Amino acid sequence: MNELEKVIEINGLTKKFKNLTAVDNLSLNVYKGDVFGFLGPNGAGKSTTIRMMLTLINPTSGNIKLFGKELKENRKDIFRKVGAIVEKPDFYLYLTAYKNLEILGKMSGADISNRNIMQILELVGLEKRYNSKVKTYSHGMKQRLGIAQALLHNPELIVLDEPTVGLDPQGIKEIRELILKLSSEKQITIFLSSHILKEIEIVANRMVIINKGKTLIEGSVKELLNNNTDSITIQFKSSSDINIILSNSEFSKNLFHITNTKLNIELDESKIPELIKLLVENKVEIYSVERRKSLEDYFLKITEKN
């Protein structure tokens, strides 16, 4: 993978709807081979950004380049290399999966052979149901068929906007495995917008977090998590007065939250023994201690701060 080869380059992107600024001077870079996580709370501007990337709406200002070319001037050439799913994919429900892809391939102008269609259906795990009408498909199968549609013209970049919305755990797992497969076996760059943070943590190598249309932070998922303070969860006996103990200690400046029998505190790893010692000395009955760094913790920390 050439990390210096930019597939997506967005600079100063802004979109205003009357008095609402949906995207505000947004900048990000996606490199060849990335599985890039595009994260933000509801209303952060993710879908608006994707719609501008796909020229479904025009930006108020700013610049988008795909494969090093200005999107506005090179739309036709660029989109030969791009596949996308935005919201729920539409199909002819009374036709088979195979027939749908055949028709959609012809509509897109792609030169698709029968063998190509079957290879794509096999790639997304639908080869055994290729002759079934789409109306008999589960939601998860329809999502995989949508990805198959995006693959028809052999793209180098796929844009997925919330591809796991409404799926059960098995469906989410199947989409996750498919994304990893497309990245590792086909070397396709993937731009993945999702609110399921655990999925981004598993599949993405790089990510950006946005809020109120602005870039908060961008970088390697691994490095961002490693630089994040540990979150410690301690289970204790409900009668313990943890709040008073912490407030009168060196840990009073740490961010912590207490429920009836649980303490969540942001803490450097080196300070864990001191915290445990303090609680034990104050006769707190501790039942368990769990240390974790998760994308969810980091996401909440960054978005709440901003």
Task: Annotate each language-model stretch with its function.
Residues 62-73, 77-78:
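Conserved ABC transporter NBD signature motif
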Residues 102, 106-129:
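Conserved ABC ATPase "signature" region
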Residues 154:
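Conserved catalytic motifs of ABC-family nucleotide-binding domains
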Residues 158-162:
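Catalytic Walker B motif of ABC-type/P-loop ATPase nucleotide-binding domains
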Residues 176-266:
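ABC transporter nucleotide-binding domain
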